[in-house]
Amino acid sequence: MNPQKIAVLGPGSWGTALSQVLNDNGHEVRIWGNNLEQMAEINEKHTNTRYFKDVVLDEKIKAYSRLDLALENVDAILFVVPTKVTRLVAKQVAQVLKHKVHILHASKGLEQGTHDRISTILEEEIPAQLRGEIVVVSGPSHAEETIVRDITLISAASNDHDEAKYAQSIFSNDYFRLYTNTDVIGVETAGALKNIIAVGAGALHGLGFGDNAKAAIITRGLAEITRLGVAMGAEPLTYSGLSGVGDLIVTGTSIHSRNWRAGDALGRGEKIADIEKNMGMVIEGVSTTKAAYELAQRLEIDMPITETIYKVLYENLDAKSGILDIMRRETRAENEFININK
């Protein structure tokens, strides 16, 4: 493939790491953000020290604070902004974009209120004549590892196989490998919902529980996010792949995960408002918990772990009491794994 001009919207840890991958593959990368000091740092010092203290970026990666300039003559746009601002940024893109491009996103969350997936937001806000089918790029990936070129394998899902292949071709190299997928709903919901379970896994660690409990929350968490995903139209097999169990393992077991760290702090008795302030980064699992809980209520899907985490986050339930509530639930068979009514 010829070198592409690619705008990466969102200069956070993952947006920065993906920018480096694309740059390594010979593409012209333009990072866009609205923090003028951060954009100047990337351009002048070739660093993004808010997220990576010791990483020097290639000087060919350019940062823009003006969206119209960042999008000028690009071949593709990669959204890596927080879920809560995705719709706003998509509206801005639609206002200044002058030609048809490939649209990809690597964000993980559900919109508050609407419960929309990211691809749904992008489809609603960016006119069809300006884009192809949306591509979801998601899977087990810590930005801290990708930025130092550690091996990473993730999924690229789209309703148009050619669009998924495009994503695969611009990203894949010796350390970063994409697999195509057609289950957009599955890949997208798996990436969003696993953040909830990661908060719970971190809380167990903060409470002092061991590996048995952590394995339990990951496997039972996988069961309930699969139930919700299938109810939304996903294929159950997707949740056993990279974007499902793969992402759940990496996010639910590692200190690199901000969702896990937030849960760990919750388990040690800290309040979520203080945790978010101290971390200084978006914790997608917090807002996703609320959206998923409301969606599960609407669809009548049983999600006991999600419900408990919701009560800890939004109703001041003590985390240890929440664990006991789950353990005291009526016993049942394990083989209701995919049964969306259990």
Swiss-Prot record:
Protein name: Glycerol-3-phosphate dehydrogenase [NAD(P)+]
Residues annotated to bind sn-glycerol 3-phosphate: 108, 139, 141, 194, 247, 257-259
Main location group: cytoplasm
InterPro entries: 6-PGluconate_DH-like_C_sf (IPR008927), 6PGD_dom2 (IPR013328), G3P_DH_NAD-dep (IPR006168), G3P_DH_NAD-dep_C (IPR006109), G3P_DH_NAD-dep_N (IPR011128), NAD(P)-bd_dom_sf (IPR036291)
SUPFAM superfamilies reported in the protein's UniProt record: 6-phosphogluconate dehydrogenase C-terminal domain-like (SSF48179), NAD(P)-binding Rossmann-fold domains (SSF51735)
Keyword Oxidoreductase: yes
Protein species of origin: Lactococcus lactis subsp. cremoris (strain MG1363)
Catalyzed reaction equations: sn-glycerol 3-phosphate + NAD(+) = dihydroxyacetone phosphate + NADH + H(+); sn-glycerol 3-phosphate + NADP(+) = dihydroxyacetone phosphate + NADPH + H(+)
GO annotation, biological process: carbohydrate metabolic process; glycerol-3-phosphate biosynthetic process; glycerol-3-phosphate catabolic process; glycerophospholipid metabolic process; phospholipid biosynthetic process
Top-rank EC class of the record's enzyme: oxidoreductase
